[in-house]
Amino acid sequence: MKTKIDYFDYDTLLQPTDWRFAAAVVGLCKYFDYFGIDYKVLCDVEEKPDNYIHGFDGIIYKSEDITEEKYLEFAENYFEKYMTHKNILNILESQEFIEEQIKLVNDLVKSKTVLKGLFDKIKFDGTNKDVFISTIEENRAEIIKNIFKNGNNLYKNYCNERLIFTEDNSTCRLRGYNVDKDRKTSNLGFCFSKESFESNDILEFDFIPFAFSNSDMRETYFVNNNFSVKSLTQTNYAFSNQLSSTENKDDKNKLMLVLQNSKDYISYDVEIISKSQDKAYYETFFVRLERLKKLRELSGKSLNFVKKINDDYWFNLEKEVYMRCLNNVLLDDVILMMLKFYFDDNAVKGYIKSRTDMLIDINVSWKGNEIMDEIKSAKSCGFLTSKKLIEMKSSNKINSYKQKIISALCAHDYDRAKEIILSLSAYVGMEFSFFYTFLENAEENKDLAFAFASALIEVSSKNN
């Protein structure tokens, strides 16, 4: 919440009452620190402003310290590697230019509309660098503003680019919160009443892009642990650094791995805001400490398995498990998928089996079921049954029974699964001790059937 105050020489208080104001606080702190501008943190001052909101920290500052000139200079520095004109100026520091450098300068000019407009009739030839340097310096603010506001991973990803550094807007500038003024507005509010539609917007929301992590990722994140300004700034700094140092993973997997290793700065329930370049809105998910602890318990477990399902979807076991862990969803469907993958052509059956067995153990621990002894029994029964079928010269029935059990489980037909397991027990002349627990409540104890089916594998009787 933004509040006008009369507090010594300061006139504005910004408190992180929701994620938008929290992100604005983080962005503003970076801005003030960059220029060495004085501001106060609410919890650090003994005498509080008269009209502050109790229960929230905040920052106290002078509104006059926020200027467009400084804002653009800050944006140029913060997102320096995306500022095309800076790349050009760096090249132009040379005294002599080779053909590749000349071509690169002209290609960089053509890559940005604002630069094409400024150099419409001029082409860099290696002898006219002074013209290029002076033109860029004379139009620097315009260049920065256009590059920044139109960058798909910069301002445009977070806000309506037409509203950059504007005030008194009727709707919020943020993506997903913004409304086209030229459209009919009668259907915006409750019962189609535009008067019931509420939106707020402040200039400080222009600092939100600086609060989100790693602009080189297609999906960026902001951790809204708004217990204090200190926790907001320090957590997001550490979070971004860990994301940067996590390599060779897609954005979601990076997030999961960072959360796994976040115990030094996240030790409580926390809200995380994400913004993807592929979506015109923000997404929020709530990470509960209980689930975060479960996620951290997965650290060190080998869940590497990737399989192409179709041109648009790759099954990533690690990602599937991590997302279900955070969302408090069990692994039943993932286990069934892995059991089915076992029968695919060219499947590395032993590898798939080991991953499936691990998933079953994780699933049982998440459920809190005290059936680990029965799980071990089911695995042992599966192995001994396979061995017995081989000895009976009936090894062809191993995969046959395995497929039948998996098909019944996929269809949630537990009566059919019981029949198949009983039939197999009679065929090999063995008693399956785990079966009685499965019989009592098949749906609750389906992991026993998962474990038994996974252990049915064509192994040599010598491999006992």
Residues covered by each model-derived region:
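Domain-exit/linker segments immediately C-terminal to small folded modules
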Residues: 178-331
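Long, contiguous all-alpha helical interaction modules
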Residues: 1-130, 134-141, 282-464
